[in-house]
Curated annotation (Swiss-Prot):
Protein source organism: Escherichia coli O139:H28 (strain E24377A / ETEC)
EC number: 2.9.1.3
Protein name: tRNA 2-selenouridine synthase
Superkingdom assignment: Bacteria
Family: Belongs to the SelU family.
SMART domains per record: RHOD
Entries under InterPro entries matching the protein: Rhodanese-like_dom, Rhodanese-like_dom_sf, SelU
Quaternary structure note: Monomer.
CDD domains: RHOD_YbbB
């Protein structure tokens, strides 16, 4: 069985989205995992704690014996069934544990005894994690063009349409604002960084690119923060600003935050609960900026939001949301973005409407 253990092997695994059967405990997987990994643990969280305690108190031999005792009989059969099914479903995959140690070797040996030869990652998750960190540091050194613009200018779509674009908000599963949450929970910080590195590696491998196209983001995207090496490079990057008419921005925001989010919530939860989730999502977003709006203005906009939701529920029309969205943009989001942009005005190299910026970026 050929093991993969060179830096190039690790990068090739990430670029190819090689399926990884990660046999670490669920708590370890939740703290950080590779994008193409599935968690089929050798030991669950409680079993891992018990074996770890035994190791500290009685040594490695006793801990190994306890592990075999805990994962035996029907439990072992159930886990073997899951590993075997995963191996057959993913014949090009690999096994992975924390450091390429006993857990992945034990599972590998059990599979071998069952007639399945399956490689493992030498160095385990730790080695892959070091690869993603180093890859991000290296790839972030390439030139960057940032796409800026006020809320609703279609910055994310523009980035998505570039062959050398990386959608940071899509990877973070958050759109970066108070209303930015999606129906997908955000990943742990380590998993987000691993996903970002894998996406950068794949994009670079496809394009052999000269520069990155990214959205002009702050350090935080929801609960995830950008790797410092990338964030530092972004502060030095040229900025192309999308300046679309206000009416076009409103159309985009209506589609993205009202029509699409309502559809997504009802699709996920059903009509009744989905409507409640959608209402809570909008109220939570507005409440998140209550302090900055001031209590009186917040209460006024919250009342308009309630009225808009009542109309939407009764008629299906989202037009009523303009009564609170327009002042929110003009009084809060637009002034805030313009203030931020003024502080980096010397970085702005191009301004234009969406199609003009897209054409300018394409020519870089």
């Amino acid at each position: 069985m050929q093991e993969r253990h060179t830096e190039q092997d690790y990068r090739a695994l990430l670029i190819a989205d090689t399926p990884i059967i990660d046999v670490r405990a669920p708590i370890e997987f939740e703290q950080g995992a590779m994008p193409a990994a599935i968690n089929l643990p050798l030991m669950n969280n409680d079993e891992r704690v018990a074996v770890g305690t035994c190791y500290k108190q009685q040594g490695s031999d006793a801990a190994l014996a306890l592990g075999h005792k805990l994962v035996a009989g029907e439990i072992r059969q159930q886990r073997m069934y899951a590993w075997r099914a995963a191996c057959l479903q993913n014949p090009q995959g690999i096994l992975c544990c924390a450091r390429g140690g006993q857990r992945s070797h034990i599972v590998q040996s059990w599979l071998h005894a069952a007639g399945i030869d399956y490689p493992l990652v030498e160095g385990g998750y730790k080695a892959l994690r070091q690869t993603t960190i180093q890859a991000t540091i290296e790839l972030a050194q390439k030139p960057i063009v940032l796409i800026g613009g006020c809320t609703g200018c279609g910055k994310t779509l523009l980035v998505q349409q570039q062959p050398n674009g990386v959608d940071l908000e899509g990877l973070a599963r958050h759109r970066g604002s108070a209303f930015g949450r999606t129906l997908q929970p955000q990943l742990s910080q380590a998993s987000f960084e691993n996903l970002l590195a894998a996406e950068m590696l794949k994009t670079d491998a496809r394009q052999n690119l000269r520069l990155w196209v990214l959205e002009d983001e702050s350090r935080m995207i929801g609960s995830n923060h950008l790797p410092e090496c990338l964030r530092e490079r972004m502060t030095q990057a040229a900025i192309a600003v999308v300046e679309d008419p206000f009416e076009i921005r409103l159309e985009r925001l209506n589609e993205e935050y009202f029509l699409r989010m309502h559809h997504d919530f009802t699709h996920a939860y059903g009509d009744e609960q989905g409507w409640q989730e959608y209402c809570e999502y909008l109220h939570h977003g507005l409440s998140a900026i209550k302090r900055r709006l001031g209590l009186q203005r917040y209460n006024e906009l919250a009342a308009r939001l309630d009225a808009a939701l009542t109309t939407q529920l009764a008629t299906g029309s989202t037009d009523g949301h303009l009564a609170w969205l327009v002042p929110l943009l003009k009084e809060y989001y637009d002034p805030m973005y313009r203030y931020q942009l003024e502080k980096k005005a010397e970085k702005v190299v191009f301004r234009g409407e969406w199609a003009e910026v897209a054409e300018w970026v394409k020519a870089r």
